UniProtKB/Swiss-Prot annotation:
The GPIb-V-IX complex functions as the vWF receptor and mediates vWF-dependent platelet adhesion to blood vessels. The adhesion of platelets to injured vascular surfaces in the arterial circulation is a critical initiating event in hemostasis. The chain crosses the membrane at residues 523-543. Residues 421-474 form the LRRCT domain. This is Platelet glycoprotein V. The lineage of its organism: Eukaryota, Metazoa, Chordata, Craniata, Vertebrata. One of its GO terms (cellular component) is cell surface. Glycans are attached at residues 51, 181, 243, 298, 312, 385, 498. Residues 544-567 are cytoplasmic. It comes from the Eukaryota. It comes from Rattus norvegicus (Rat).
Amino acid sequence: MLRSVLLSAVLSLVGAQPFPCPKTCKCVVRDAVQCSGGSVAHIAELGLPTNLTHILLFRMDRGVLQSHSFSGMTVLQRLMLSDSHISAIDPGTFNDLVKLKTLRLTRNKISHLPRAILDKMVLLEQLFLDHNALRDLDQNLFQKLLNLRDLCLNQNQLSFLPANLFSSLGKLKVLDLSRNNLTHLPQGLLGAQIKLEKLLLYSNRLMSLDSGLLANLGALTELRLERNHLRSIAPGAFDSLGNLSTLTLSGNLLESLPPALFLHVSWLTRLTLFENPLEELPEVLFGEMAGLRELWLNGTHLRTLPAAAFRNLSGLQTLGLTRNPLLSALPPGMFHGLTELRVLAVHTNALEELPEDALRGLGRLRQVSLRHNRLRALPRTLFRNLSSLVTVQLEHNQLKTLPGDVFAALPQLTRVLLGHNPWLCDCGLWPFLQWLRHHLELLGRDEPPQCNGPESRASLTFWELLQGDQWCPSSRGLPPDPPTENALKAPDPTQRPNSSQSWAWVQLVARGESPDNRFYWNLYILLLIAQATIAGFIVFAMIKIGQLFRTLIREELLFEAMGKSSN
């Protein structure tokens, strides 16, 4: 018994001794080797021991992988042969690799695989064939790989897949078919993948997603279909994907979507639909998706949207409706229910106006971008009760004026971008400028807003305007410039008229009428006549009083003279 134990110990020590490492290799770990350079066709000449468990070969010269390259390596578990310009593989090359669990043949020039090349590797769990030149695959190529979990076939030239190609891969969890030339996926192709969690099909040429294709993928959590040629998606195509968390459909040719398409994917946390020529959305498209945090609908042909389009997306934090050149109107209440929304991007569209309640209920909103639209005015209460709002972008619109209190109730506001608008710097804008005078730090200095009119102030920035003299005083006179179309809008009835203006005069001007001044001229003439009459009366009275005084003085002198003569 003791002799057996000692013999085993000696044998293990002998096995632990490092083998002679080839010159072009590194052998820093026992049972593992890393080699570069040399020729693919002469791997056997490296003299690698047969008891290795890990082999990494890379950057080798172009050639054919020989059938005896790995002879006798029955304990090998990881074989990585990448970036080596392998042009072909001889049949039987991997026949001795019965314990192999990972085979990586990434970034080579392989265009064809022999039918039974993988049959002996029944324990294989990971197979990487990406970044090669594969054009087709034999339908029985993966038949013996019952334990395969990860299969990467991306970045090849595959245009067709046999219907039963993956029929034996019941344990598969990751399947990457991205960046190929696939135009169609046959029915039944994914019928056995009940444990599949990640399916990557992006950057192909798929034209449709047929009904039933994904029916057995109940464990799927990630499905990527972006950058294909999809023109249609079958109704209910995603109904069985109850665990799906990521779905990307951006960069396709979708002009419409079936009603209720996303009704049953309630666990989605990421959904992309941008860069599709969508012309409309169905009234009901989304189900309850409390976990969806981000949604982008930019680059479409949408003209408007259903009022309740986003009503079920209560957990949404970022919503992007940008670069839609035909989007000219938003329905009232469109964003109602998005109580968690932080970022709202509605820029680079064709919006000319916004509903008064467009942002109502978005108490957590921090950033709103409305730049690059055609907005001519903003509702006075648009930003009311948005106590968390930090940034407002309004540059590149057609705004001429803003209500004086449009940003008044935003305690967290730190940035307002107003550049590239045709601002009309008359008295109609003065209330807003008065507010802005106390909040100049909000304006961006890179592209400051400039006056487009009137002519006397054209090209002046708001900074320059506010640093000059008070050109629209509130205590005297009428505006120094003739009233313009913008200034002739009727004042808000809830506001009291400015003390420097007659309310009747403001109403006449608001109606475009010239005030009748004849009454004032008549009154002025009457006042002059009255003044002249009073002045004449005073002069006449003064003359009479002077004559009276002279008479009294004369009589007094006569009385004194008579008294003296009697004595």
